[in-house]
Amino acid sequence: IVETVPRRDHVVPVRYRDGRDWHQVLTAAGPDRVSGGQWEEAYAREYFRCVTGEGMLVWLFRDVRKGTWFLHGWWD
């Protein structure tokens, strides 16, 4: 689950849940947009590199077509 705030042409994550814990997003860089599907099912994603209140750097993305969010990874 990701909570967002609207921007001009996209939404920005401000908080996300990983399991039972909520994490505040202090800064979010993006979106980096990726799309395709000429020979397969079409897809469109928006990736954000985020810094949390705990100082973690995480990678979130939104499936634009479905509106669902995913924790893609993190850096340590």
Identify the role of each PLM range.
Residues 1-76:
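Non-catalytic peripheral regions of nucleotide-handling enzymes
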